[in-house]
A protein has these predicted regions:
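Extracellular distal adhesion/interaction modules in secreted or cell-surface proteins
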Residues: 1-218
Length: 218
């Protein structure tokens, strides 16, 4: 709900939301829905953390989600977020088969505990938190997201540290990070359940057809 998860600052607390969209191949179809996540970042005093709200899975591969966290130039975390290195289908979508929430009709087909629903939670297995006062570097915090596919191949969503793993041979990114869209996602009976939402392309629909100006900018 908006009153529980607002973007903004209050005293020494702050929250921010992003949508991160991935291509799962070095030769992708540029629909950027192979894995889509909604991330909530939170600062409270000297503590910083995040949690992941899974949105869509348009990949037939075993996809694993990872993150790299920096404070300034100091890397404080790099790794996969799933317990036991479980893939995204297992960890986020209860092992549901097929494409999830990527259909051309834009109909939600995700099932949680056997019921079709568009709302998933920020999963406890994805939550991470650090006490930044223990890090000597006084630079800003940033998080760079990646997926692991095809064994140990890592594809990044616009990483400054892993540029060669962020762009394909055509110079197109393997992932997009969308911030502060001003849009929201509403679930019947629950109200607003996702802030700063991004309407990612449907299956086999290149992002160039949906957001031509964004594509030209890329």
């Amino acid at each position: 709900p908006a009153d529980e998860y607002p973007n903004g600052f209050a005293g020494n607390k702050a929250q921010l939301f992003q949508v991160v969209c991935f291509e799962d191949s070095r030769s992708g179809d540029y629909d950027y829905n192979d894995l889509v996540i909604h991330v909530k970042y939170q600062w409270s005093g000297t503590r910083f953390g995040f949690g992941v709200h899974p949105i869509a899975l348009g990949s037939t591969k075993e996809v694993r989600l990872g993150a790299v966290v920096y404070k300034g130039s100091t890397r404080i975390f790099k790794g996969l977020l799933a317990p036991g290195n479980a893939d995204a289908r297992t960890q986020y979508f209860q092992s549901q088969a097929g494409f999830i929430n990527t259909g051309a009709d834009r109909q939600i087909n995700q099932r949680i505990d056997g019921r079709v629903t568009g709302w998933n939670q920020y999963l406890g297995s994805t939550c991470r938190c650090w006490d930044l006062s223990k890090i000597a570097d006084d630079g800003a915090v940033r998080v760079e997201w990646y997926i692991q596919v095809d064994g140990d191949v890592e594809l990044y969503a616009l990483s400054t540290a892993y540029l060669n793993q962020s762009f394909d041979k055509q110079g197109r990114p393997y992932g997009l990070v969308i911030t502060q869209t001003g849009s929201s996602y509403t679930e019947d009976g629950k109200g607003v359940v996702g802030l700063d939402w991004f309407n990612y392309p449907c299956e086999n629909t290149p992002i160039s057809e949906v957001y031509p100006e964004l594509w030209n900018w890329l």
